[in-house]
């Protein structure tokens, strides 16, 4: 799992206005700004099956998907901050790869990458070579991966009984 963090800060980007041949530096105050919501810590306790309930991912998250050429991209957004640690624990690259093995080139040996997007309560997955060529080059029912997010929302996730 990798994190995606925007690296450019407003104070590090020179801002100029160009009028004809002249350039004018512009100073922009860089105080305040977006403060992302806190994210719940990873669960540390090991729960027994009697202490958990298994629910479909759709109870805990939203999803959206699409194509990047022959690759499928799936974004998963937790409905509440306290759900995110359970999403991270359940939706490993291996779990998502196995779940989508029927569409991945190489089956269960196919390649899936995962990124966390701090402050957005979300995960992003890239399923390599999952679209049979993608777009007009594919003979699949969903050549642009638009259904993949909806398919993933059926994935079973175990959570503590009191969480929901």
Report the location of each language-model feature.
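Conserved mixed alpha/beta catalytic, RNA-binding, or beta-rich assembly cores of soluble enzyme
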Residues: 46-107
